[in-house]
Amino acid sequence: NYENLDKIKKAVGKEHLVLDLSCRYRSEPGKTSGYYIVTDRWQKYTDEMVTPELLDELSRYCVEFLVHAVDVEGKANGIEKPLAKLLGDWGKIPITYAGGVHSFEDLKELADLGCNHLNVTIGSALDIFGGTMPYQKVLQEISDLNKKL
């Protein structure tokens, strides 16, 4: 709802806004296949397909996107590679990718597919949350990947 985006932007300023975009892949007859923004606990598809044009439009209201790949979120079973590529190819403002990271290979793939434009959030895969990825090693890996920029 662009009217509400305008209101919040005027109230707090674009420089204080991060838009949270929950994205789910949709492929069904009569619809263009792609990642769509979903609402209501990730159950309802909107008509908004994630495209460079949509990201351009929404970036008028914020300084960063937090993008949830909801089909893989919380599963620690791999990232949504096509979504990471789409976001990285666009890369005009900071984007934090969330969803599916479960290995150091995923971090490397996000850096490559995301053209080094993506930040990452890791949840259940971290050892501090019961996962297998040691927190300190993740910090080091991300630092090493950033040095390659």
What label would you give each PLM region?
Residues 71-73, 101-104, 127:
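Short Gly/Pro-enriched loop/turn and capping motifs at secondary-structure junctions
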Residues 5-11, 108-149:
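C-terminal helical cap(s) of enzyme catalytic domains, especially alpha/beta-barrels
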Residues 47-52, 77-86, 135-139:
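Charged helix-capping and loop-helix junction motifs
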Residues 18-22, 68, 96-99, 121-123:
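A cross-family glycoside hydrolase active-site/sugar-binding cleft signature
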Residues 76-77, 130:
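RNA substrate-recognition surfaces in RNA-acting enzymes
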Residues 1-8, 82-120:
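Catalytic cores of alpha/beta
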Residues 19, 65, 87, 110, ...:
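Conserved, mostly hydrophobic/aromatic
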Residues 1-73:
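Conserved anion-binding
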